[in-house]
Amino acid sequence: MMEIHTRKGYDINISGMPSHDIEILEKPARVALLPERIPFVKPRLKVKVDDPVKVGSPVFEDKRNPQLVFLSPGGGRIADIKYGPRRVIKEVVIELDPDEDFEAFPVISEADLDGMERQKLVKMIMTGGLWPLFRELPFRDVPNPDVVPPSVIVSLNSKEPFQPLPEAYLNDRIDLFEFGIKILEKLSENLLISTSSDDGFAQNRLNGFVTHTCNGSYPADDPGVLLYHIKKGPDENRSWYINGQDVLLLAMLFKTGKYPVDRTVVLGGSLARERKHLKTRMGVPLNHITKGRADDTGTARYIVGGVFKGYTASKDSYMGFYESSLVLIPQGDEKEFFGFARPGFNKPSRSRAFLSFLNKSSMAMDCNCHGEVRACINCGFCGEVCPVDILPQFTYKTILADEIEEALDHGLLDCVECGLCTYVCPSKIELKTIFKKTKKAYFLEQL
């Protein structure tokens, strides 16, 4: 087992962290697929409103690669298809039947898996709708099934606040996880399984499987950060990664012959009354998660996917294909009289401009930026927290000058989109958003 130490990064001291308690949610009335939240996919619908669907029925495919299909997370009928600007498909809503029907997929035993060719295995995963669980670095797109990756990284947990713990989703399912690992071993000769150095559960229960422990502040255990520290050459840049919880879905597909929809999600944040792990299903409504568990006063910001890497959603929306956390924090619209002159003992900040650096207890955070966007002052704060040694302030300026090649030389593609540069920037510049959009534009140019 190799230990990787990341010097840079930052851990925010935020309140509202979830407990280790696990609650099983009742079945929701509706679930949904959110094509808009799946990067680099141009959806082509295969259903229309009022069409009947089973769990595992095709709902849409990628126009660029029709082999890449996305399946229904519920059995019932298509209740609604919601569009955004320029007819972007935002949500495909499915009203569930009391007794859901399942599409049948082949059941594969461990003996069958041992003698199976890689090409056949890949085709079965794609037909089963789980190929999008794999993401390819550095753009985090769905990988090409015809390419053998230099490595597959299994990320068991995340140092980003409010992510599910391995002991919550792996408890009593170790055998299923081991079968999922055997599936991954057929896809690449180099399988890496990483966990945080402070995760005792994974290191004790999966001692024979964990290959790397990641030591350091957020985002030390991000697959991109791990690859940055261990890669030996540029040919490893296009490695794949998959989350530990998704490995269970692969195993369930082959073990049961049914499209798996189980999900363990986290509800947290200072405005959540019951902060805990919840066992539910893919595409669950956000208001189903928060029902009776949150202060619904209309002042909460619903953040899906984490406070750094997530996105704001309406409370009437649904959990996305990749997301497994819901955070409720105040909007922060209230104005503060002479806020600039106050010592800020309870204002979280990485700098020592406020006295909050003396406060070691967790602090409630809101969405107030406490200022507007202003010019970059070359303070270097963003470079001090960047885990992959980019100098974001200079990369940002090359992008503004439209010098994309120079930005690539600065290490733009190594950016793991952790959001720390945006968080610590005193000029309130959305550095992560700028870098992410630039990477996306560069990726689309290569197609």
Regions found by a protein language model. Name each.
Residues 1-46:
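N-terminal, Lys/Arg-enriched amphipathic/low-complexity engagement segments
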Residues 67-75:
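Short coil-to-beta-strand transition motifs
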Residues 47-61, 79-80, 420:
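Short, well-structured beta-strand-loop connectors
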Residues 30-35, 75-77, 81:
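Translation machinery proteins
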Residues 32-41, 359-380, 399-417:
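Ferredoxin-like iron-sulfur electron-transfer modules
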Residues 349-360:
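Metal/cofactor-centered catalytic core regions of large enzymes
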Residues 68, 82-288, 292-343, 347-351, ...:
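Buried, small/hydrophobic-residue-enriched core segments of structured protein domains
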Residues 52, 58, 75-77, 285, ...:
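Residue-level marker of beta-strand positions
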